[in-house]
Amino acid sequence: MPLFIIALDGHLGLFYGFLLAFIGAYVIVAGVSFMFLYLVRPASVAHLKIQQQMPSRKEVLHEIGWSSLTLLVWAVMAVILIYFIDRGLTQMYSGIESLGVTYFVFSILFLVISHDAYFYWVHRLMHDSDFAYKYIHSIHHESKNPTPFAIFSFGPIEAVLMGLYVYLIVFLVPINIYALAALFVFDTTANLFGHMGYELIPKKVTKSRIGRMFNTSVIHDLHHSGQQYNYSLYFRFWDKFMKTANQDNEKVWEEFHARNEK
């Protein structure tokens, strides 16, 4: 019998709970952002749209539909994870005081850095392989002009790959549930900025010494419009180290800000 059926048996309440929580987070984060940036669209931010044309209704519905399927997949994966935790098969622990606050804080930093590395290599492999791109990753790239609704717009296999990182970590490293929650919040926020279609972070921030370490909306938007290079998620390190940064990053970024400073 498939593991997900065994895990769901007697845990349907948990499944629906996770599903509602994921949907709620998606509606609040993506829905509210879309409403503000694409429906209300105040003059104070309208000029910050990276691609001047607006996405079609078909593109938006595509993003919502596939994101909904991703949330369903993740709810099933969350229940399976609970199944493993209940049987003591993971290194998940409760109570921050168990291993101390210092460990808890550093575990969050570890999650962010290791997840960034995991995402880069999985993402790059899905582009380097024509087969993987066509059958796994191409759904996400149908968003040529992404909106906030694209943050979880994956096919089912890619949704599993994106969620698989959590499984790998909790079997290897002691992790508190609140540290995972912090990663989810950080990841969702980073994804939102990468796919919102607007560059809202001021130039003086993104051009600062610290700001240059992080991805920007313009950089990831270039990835969606060109499909090559700029594979990183949070930080720009992997693209720079592996020489997969788009050579036009700085040029396009400067042109964008020059256009908006007139």
Feature-to-residue mapping (PLM):
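Cytosolic/stromal cytosol-facing helical appendages immediately following the last transmembrane segment
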Residues: 1-25, 39-42, 47-57, 129-138, ...
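Hydrophobic alpha-helical membrane-embedded segments
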Residues: 21-41, 74-78, 111-122, 190
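Alpha-helical transmembrane segments and their membrane-interface junctions
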Residues: 71-90, 161-173
